[in-house]
Amino acid sequence: MADKGSGDKLLYCSFCGKSQHEVRKLIAGPSVFICDECVELCNDIIREEIQQADSQKGASSDLPTPHEISGILDQYVIGQGQAKKALAVAVYNHYKRLRSSSGSGDVELAKSNILLIGPTGSGKTLLAQTLARLLNVPFVIADATTLTEAGYVGEDVENIIQKLLQKCDYDVDKAKQGIVYIDEIDKISRKADNPSITRDVSGEGVQQALLKLIEGTTASVPPQGGRKHPNQEFVQVDTSNILFICGGAFSGLEKVIRGRTEKGGIGFGAQVKNVDENKRDAELLHQVEPEDLIKYGLIPEFVGRLPVVATLDELDEAALVQILTEPKNALTKQFAKLFKMEGVDLEFRDDALNAIAKRALLRRTGARGLRSIIEHALLDTMYDLPSLKGVSKVVVDNALISGEGQPLLIYSEQGDQPLAAGA
């Protein structure tokens, strides 16, 4: 090591050219010198290269397998096994495609966007949200009913990409790997089988506008959420790697499928239709073909951009009871945690869970209606509980859900007492 005052000869760093008087230390080698500043710079370069290599290695190894994706979805969404399998494979292949480094001569892998078909409250949105949270990518929900063609009153389709950019603080590279869920996609179906002389700006027109966005194009988005105007610089976002998931209830689609699958005739030699009264609409939806979606009102080009079609079953009473109790964020667990903040335990009896599920079925709102039923049943209890002293437990039974009784309050030193109305 060469110190600043050693010898009469002035020494210089062989890398940056600084003299021994301009640096703190000068390290000597065989006819070579390096200063402490260059050593520190080399350490920084090596550290960055190691971090980049580790991140690339971690990116490929962190991608869960389809089995793992489906297993994580099971923790949040009850049932819908076939839809989970289709989603898991499609998402795995999509992000494997993004993380693979393909050369110029390699085969180009096309993107497989997804169409989810199922009744309201069956878990379409929750599946997409859980996938985005699992993969740690930006996620945004768009409502197809608010979209119109460019130039008309309503939201432009490029507003979807603007929302995605806002989600990730206008980090374009991060937005390019996001997931966009377009809800109520069935509401932009063509209004009639034959083209009308009046322009359909919220139906077929929106489908036409979404075509390029879903397939992959460069969208021009105003910076920081501003409105479009001339002489403005736009943020350019390539949508080729954004995964689009479209979902809708497609009410009436089962009739289209039934018309295709059940053939009949007229006359003595006609084959009599064997209409299975027990054949549920959900079973028919599993037989959906692209031609059915086209007849329903989606244009052929739009159907072609959604090659992966997954159907969700309508939830029955048993599935709704499972949704109330089994998922990680089950409603009974959420309300139990809410009551625990007051120092009170909350118990749902089995007859109460069945009653909640039956009421949700009557409302035909699926799992989405479960929370409102519980909120309504526990409204008075949550209003009075903070003012009551000594309550250790609240028990919810069938009588409370049906509106014929009050919850049982268990006090720390007394027996069961029903909560008096307006107490």
Swiss-Prot record:
GO MF, any single term? protein dimerization activity
Provide the residue positions that the database annotates as binding Zn(2+).
13, 16, 35, 38
Listed binding positions for ATP are 119-126
- Is Zinc one of the keywords UniProt gives this record? yes
A single Gene Ontology CC annotation of this entry is:
HslUV protease complex
Instruction: Keywords in alphabetical order, please.
Output: ATP-binding, Chaperone, Metal-binding, Nucleotide-binding, Zinc
Per the UniProt entry, what are the Gene Ontology biological process annotations, in alphabetical order? cell division; proteolysis involved in protein catabolic process
InterPro entries named in the record = AAA+_ATPase, ATP-dep_Clp_protease_ClpX, ATPase_AAA_core, Clp_ATPase_C, Clp_protease_ATP-bd_su_ClpX, ClpX_bact, P-loop_NTPase, Znf_CppX_C4
Record domain ClpX-type ZB: where: 1-54
Q: Name one Pfam family in it.
A: ClpB_D2-small
Keyword Ion transport included in the entry's annotation: no
| Assembly, per entry | Component of the ClpX-ClpP complex. Forms a hexameric ring that, in the presence of ATP, binds to fourteen ClpP subunits assembled into a disk-like structure with a central cavity, resembling the structure of eukaryotic proteasomes.
Q: Which family does it belong to?
A: Belongs to the ClpX chaperone family.
Tell me the function of this protein.
ATP-dependent specificity component of the Clp protease. It directs the protease to specific substrates. Can perform chaperone functions in the absence of ClpP.
Question: Which HAMAP family would you find in this protein's record?
Answer: ClpX (MF_00175)
Q: What is this protein called?
A: ATP-dependent Clp protease ATP-binding subunit ClpX
Taxonomic path: Bacteria, Pseudomonadati, Pseudomonadota, Betaproteobacteria, Nitrosomonadales
Query: What's the encoding gene here?
Result: clpX
